[in-house]
């Protein structure tokens, strides 16, 4: 593992749960519950960034733009899931808010190895989808370094689209590449 990767928060041992494999079921569930209690405070600290992102999205949609989510693996699945719920929940066109995952629809149910490792595949998505300066592109990457996501946000910025990053690693490469970054850890 290279030094940068080894330094990422997501690659560290969580000292509070390092003995989870030695616990009984109730102990495991209590550890998970304790970790879940951290989430609201972490999100609370990101409210200024979340507000900037929401305002950016609202302005884009009011101006005729669209919102896109991009990610790989679980990050991509979550973006696709969120986007897919907007049509039935809010009555908006499925074209207005879209989720895309490295490896395409097959990757929603099965791992598509190496698709996340191509910055070129990410860049190509912007042209394929006709993303313009009117749109907002959100890159989701727990590590903050997924090449597919970096390719997406870099190319989106090159065409003038606003960019948002969502990651669990503060001071990540993704954070440095986007207009607004939400990094709640």
Regions of interest found by a model, annotated:
Residues 35, 63-64, 177:
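Structured helix-beta-strand junction loops
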Residues 1-42, 46:
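Cofactor-/ligand-binding subdomain signature composed of acidic, glycine-rich
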Residues 42, 50, 174-175:
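Flexible, glycine/charged-enriched surface loops at secondary-structure junctions
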Residues 45-62:
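A short, well-structured juxtamembrane/interface segment
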Residues 20-24, 49, 114-121:
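Short secondary-structure boundary/capping elements
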Residues 11-14, 24, 51-55, 66:
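Short, positively charged patches
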Residues 68, 72-185:
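Glycine-rich phosphate-binding loops that contact phosphosugars or nucleotide phosphates
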